[in-house]
Amino acid sequence: MTEQHQPPSDLRLRAVVPAPPKIVYEALTDPAALRVWLAEHADVQLPGKYEFWGRYTPDGAEPHQRVLHVDERTIQFAWTVDGVETTAQFELAEDEDGTLVTLSQSDLPSFQDVLADTAGARGALQTFWSLAIANLADYLSGRELTPKCDFTSAELHASVVIDAAPDKVFDSMIQPEQFRKWFGANVDIEPYVGGRFAMGGLELDPGGAKFVEFEPGRKATLRFADNETTSWELEGSDGKTRLTMVHSGFDPANPPYPGWAGWLGGIAGLRRYHELPRRRSIWRQVEIAGVPAGMFAIDQ
């Protein structure tokens, strides 16, 4: 363990989770807990070791973390991903609603490389952490977790049950003001076959994806400029909705994990939006170097 470096700056995520700092710190450092909300495998023996790896971790065939600094509120570690050493840090602070968790990381690829699918495993780190922190919040609440992204699979498919009727869930996925609240991004949506769907808004993405299927309350399919598709299917039972999401049409040798992990993190927010309607979003800040202004919509 060495002296603490400056906090990493390429990525900063801040979220409030529903537990005091001591309990959150335990969830961050107990290997059994980490194997529930973060990774397939974990080995933690502080102050000397903080490792996690497996199929739910980018470049996760082996552990590649090295502790830099730990104290009662901070865990900072080097993490080599695709041969590039990054620095990641968890920092905890008290909050009136629990604990403010700040995750920061350095040495990430450019946003343009991520969009072009040329960023490799490092390109998935932002959405990997967003999904992980959402699952940390649900873990601490005793709620069912959202499926993790399997970085070894070329099948991008997930199914969750949401405690709300299909019409309400569907409307929240195609009404921009509702979408903004649970996904945390601005969006323009034209809700009909041939209509556009533009993350960040049509000013940032004039072409957008286009709906090629649209059945209100039941199903929608988006086709992107590269001919990849994302489909949502909703099935109701006893006032609840089984939402199944599938992404297809990509090169199986290069699955678009960054975008898929982003959708999974969104599903976590969608579940909380309907099942915990009196609570505000967990997110307080999302900063990613190079992302255009106006992309994110976080209620401070």
Where are these regions (language model features)?
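Beta-strand/loop substructures that line and gate deep hydrophobic ligand-binding cavities in soluble
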Residues: E3-H5, D10, T74, A78-S130, ...
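Glycine-rich portal/gate segments that line the openings of hydrophobic small-molecule binding cavities
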Residues: A32-T87, Q178-T229, G236-D238, M295-Q300
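Hydrophobic beta-strand core residues of beta-sandwich domains
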Residues: V44, I162-D163, P191, Q285, ...
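Hydrophobic pocket/interface hotspot
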Residues: V24, L34, V67, F77, ...
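Short amphipathic alpha-helical signal-transduction/dimerization elements
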Residues: S130-S141, I267-R278
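Hydrophobic ligand-binding cavity/cleft-lining segments
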Residues: M1-D43, L131, N135-D188, Q300
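Acidic/histidine-enriched, glycine/proline-rich intrinsically disordered or flexible terminal extensions
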Residues: T146, S281-Q300
